[in-house]
């Protein structure tokens, strides 16, 4: 028997979260995200954040109508993922290129930058001749 669990964020379902105003949503988020949300949306200090939110709302409206969603690109790595963004793909800049980030309900409350890594794992090759002291005694090919 398979049990399907509904997604909840701090006791609220996704539909309840989508209906909440940003001020109410900020109250249930952790302190760091709450301060960031209120600073951006209550004081209106960042025009870039508000422009991105408008783009997201337009894309969500098109997606609900069944039309093709436009590509949303942003450099705002400090933008908090909101419930209305679920289902969209946002391309986040990692310093070199735009990395597509598929927004799922589990990502609500996180920053966009968390999902577009700025560094990649270093993969070293084989050491060459004279790379170490011990290779001085290796026979040449």
Curated annotation (Swiss-Prot):
| SUPFAM superfamilies reported in the protein's UniProt record | Ribosomal protein S19
Mind listing the GO molecular function terms for this protein?
A: rRNA binding; structural constituent of ribosome
State a GO cellular component annotated for this protein: cytosolic small ribosomal subunit
Q: Which Gene3D superfamilies match?
A: 30s Ribosomal Protein S19, Chain A (3.30.860.10)
Q: Matching HAMAP family, A to Z?
A: Ribosomal_uS19
Gene from which this protein is expressed:
rps19
InterPro entries found in the cross-reference section:
Ribosomal_uS19, Ribosomal_uS19_CS, Ribosomal_uS19_euk/arc, Ribosomal_uS19_SF
**Stated role:** Protein S19 forms a complex with S13 that binds strongly to the 16S ribosomal RNA.
Q: What is this protein called?
A: Small ribosomal subunit protein uS19
Q: Does the keyword RNA-binding apply?
A: yes
- On the tree of life, the source organism's domain of life is Archaea
Similarity field:
Belongs to the universal ribosomal protein uS19 family.
Keywords from UniProt, A to Z, are:
Ribonucleoprotein, Ribosomal protein, RNA-binding, rRNA-binding
GO annotation (BP), single: ribosomal small subunit assembly
The family database entries (PANTHER family) matched by this protein are listed as: RIBOSOMAL PROTEIN S19P FAMILY MEMBER, SMALL RIBOSOMAL SUBUNIT PROTEIN US19
GTP-binding as a keyword of this entry, yes or no, is no
């Amino acid at each position: 028997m398979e049990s399907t669990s509904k997604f909840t964020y701090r006791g609220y379902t996704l539909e309840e979260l989508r209906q909440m105003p940003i001020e109410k949503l900020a109250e249930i988020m952790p302190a760091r995200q709450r301060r960031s949300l209120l600073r951006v949306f209550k004081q209106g200090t960042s025009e870039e954040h508000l422009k991105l939110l408008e783009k997201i709302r337009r894309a969500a409206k098109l997606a609900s109508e069944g039309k093709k969603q436009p590509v949303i690109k942003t450099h705002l790595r400090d933008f908090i993922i909101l419930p209305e963004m679920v289902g969209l793909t946002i391309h986040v800049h990692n310093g070199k290129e735009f990395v597509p980030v598929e927004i799922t309900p589990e990502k609500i409350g996180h920053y966009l930058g968390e999902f577009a890594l700025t560094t990649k794992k270093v993969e070293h090759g084989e050491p060459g001749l004279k790379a170490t002291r011990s290779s001085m005694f290796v026979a040449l090919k």
